[in-house]
Regions:
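A conserved acidic beta->alpha catalytic loop
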Residues: 41-49, 101
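Hydrophobic helical membrane-anchoring modules
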Residues: 1-4, 180-252
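Acceptor/aglycone-binding surface of glycosyltransferases and processive sugar-polymer synthases
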Residues: 63-66, 70-76, 91, 104-181, ...
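Donor nucleotide-sugar binding loop of glycosyltransferases
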Residues: 17-20, 44, 104
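Short, well-formed alpha-helical segments that are part of the catalytic scaffolds
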Residues: 16-30
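Conserved donor nucleotide-binding strand/loop of the catalytic core
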Residues: 38, 49-88
Length: 252
């Protein structure tokens, strides 16, 4: 294991997560090997940036919302600037976490070891079934998930269990290989395809993580529509056969 690989920097894209970001940052800072947490506040209208900074994260801010992929790239670019200023901060491993994990982010340690030891190039968390705030099951996620999973399978031959999971650990080399990232919510799907096409190793790991699950209200439906748009674009840019979504909707 190289010294650089053993140094882990946690990257957290965040928008309007003031209620959870401090707990997420605090839990991430205590993970083994994590030396730094960088949060990109992606145009929040609340106190996300202030709460993240108070919890010990380095904060990069977008004046307007630019999407998840752009937020991750800005945070990694900020890491590069820090490394130029102080070579002791050089990190060979990145841990990508969603901002709404809260204290459950403390369970992400199993993602790290396979990457820093060289057993895997990219690890992905498989989350348990999620519930909304009122205790009901999360709803309406099937079409996006199925589109992502079938698209990845058609392009690579591998069928993922968690194609949309944002909880990922990877080497800097793998991140650079997958860059520029697919835009917005297509980031994870694009990354998975690019890594597999490069002949690298992906390991999915079951981890007990909890995030703010979406329901079936209008806001949730609009969110999933944006996800489907970005996932479809990421797949199309990588050669997915046109009409995939129509075939899934028709049950083919």
């Amino acid at each position: 294991m190289s010294a650089a690989l053993s140094r882990v920097v946690c990257i957290i894209p965040a928008k309007d997560e003031e209620a959870r970001i401090a707990a997420t940052v605090g839990a991430a800072r205590d993970l083994p090997g994590v030396e730094l947490v960088i949060v990109c506040d992606d145009g929040s209208s609340d106190g996300t940036a202030q709460h993240a900074g108070a919890a010990g994260a380095i904060v990069v801010s977008h004046k307007r919302n630019r999407g998840k992929a752009a937020a991750v790239e800005s945070a990694v670019n900020a890491l590069g600037v820090l490394e130029q200023r102080d070579s002791r901060l050089e990190a060979g491993t990145l841990l990508l976490l969603d901002a709404d994990l809260g204290e459950s982010a403390a369970n992400c340690a199993p993602l790290i070891n396979p990457v820093v030891t060289g057993a895997a190039d990219l690890t992905i968390a498989v989350l348990p079934a999620q519930q909304t705030a009122d205790g009901s099951a999360a709803g309406g996620f099937g079409l996006v998930m199925t589109t992502a999973s079938r698209g990845i399978a058609e392009l690579t031959g591998w069928t993922p269990r968690a194609p949309l999971s944002g909880q990922r650990c990877l080497t800097r080399r793998v991140f650079e290989l997958a860059s520029p990232l697919a835009a917005g919510w297509g980031m994870e799907v694009g990354m998975t395809i690019d890594v597999l096409r490069a002949g690298l190793r992906i390991e999915e790991i079951e981890i007990d993580l909890r995030h703010r699950a979406t329901g079936t209200d209008l806001s949730s439906q609009l969110h999933r529509a944006k996800q489907l748009r970005d996932v479809s674009r990421a797949l199309a840019a990588r050669g997915a056969v046109s009409g995939l979504v129509k075939r899934i909707r028709s049950g083919r």
